[in-house]
Amino acid sequence: MSDLSNTPFSLLELSPMKEHETVSQTLANSVTYAQTADKLGFNRFWMAEHHNMRGIVCAATSVLIGHIAGKTQNIRVGAGGVMLPNHPPLVVAEQFGTLESLYPGRIDLGLGRAPGSDPITSRALRRDEQRAEHFNDEVTELQALLGPYKGDSPVRAIPGEDTNVPIWLLGSSLYSAGLAAKKGLPYAFAGHFAPRFVEDAIALYRREFQPSEVLDKPYVMLGLPIVAADTDEQAQFLATTAKQRILALMRGKPLWLKEPVATMEGLWTAQEKMQVENFLGLSVVGGQASVKHKLSMIKQTLQVDEFIFTNDLYELSDRQHALEILASIMN
């Protein structure tokens, strides 16, 4: 098994919401969660971008990044990620250049090309699907806007210029892996919801990686769903919250956090069970020893440099306790 002592642990936050909770309460919980991660020595705290999804309140990603960075001390805070075809590269450069100026050395910019929502909402965002086909060009444009001014463009990101905010490429496909390799950028694979191509994508990225000004060797961060508790049995019980959430997603229902249940039997069909389990195929669920063993095996098998975890538990206290367990493994 691989040693985890030198493997950074990070968090991906979607600001999950209970049905009768206010947005203010949910966001306050995300801040408390981030502060716990900060005190425990986690490496990054990234906010996702999702629109028009009841039960998830991370639509204004850059606003939340600024708020959380201001409430924490050391942890890197960033986007996991900005769906670039939803936004003009200049606006993204200005936003993240501002964040980097406010919180120097603590801001990350992860980029994806998915809508982050359904087709109707995409149209409301004025998203042009053809822009997704030019994702490579827009990443290059954004890199130029955040880099030093070279005197050959009438458009400059002020603030943003020469902040060199670290850019990551996010994805769950061979395309994203290949593009990250070609550009010499760090790569984050979305194993927390799309584990199907994880082995092929990481292998492709490492095989085709081309050193760049920002990275001399490949760097892989893997997203995983995590449920860590005092015992394996308690973790399996708490994991039913995430299972109910994914079941709701597949049924087109709101994604409220639901209380854990003793059994999922009767809540899903056999086909739905298979679909949910495939979705959560890389889930790491268990007590400290089980979690440590599973993470060590995944690191060794997939050659992972860093883990970034989703942690969809019903109670904030359980989410915080999961972080304490992870920190004990990390340290």
Name what the model sees in each region:
Residues 13-28, 82-90, 161-171, 279-288:
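Active-site mouth loops of central-metabolism enzymes
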Residues 1-71:
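N-terminal beta1-alpha1-beta2 module of alpha/beta enzyme domains
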Residues 9-13, 45-47, 77-79, 107-111, ...:
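Hydrophobic faces of well-ordered beta-strands that scaffold small-molecule active sites
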Residues 9, 37, 41, 49, ...:
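Conserved, mostly hydrophobic/aromatic
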Residues 4-23, 85-148, 187:
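Flexible, glycine-rich active-site loops centered on histidine and acidic residues
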Residues 2-4, 38, 65-73, 100-107, ...:
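Acidic (Asp/Glu)-rich catalytic clusters
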Residues 129-156, 197-304:
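An alpha-helical appendage that flanks or caps ligand/catalytic pockets
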Residues 177-196, 202:
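A conserved active-site cap/scaffold subdomain adjacent to cofactor or substrate pockets
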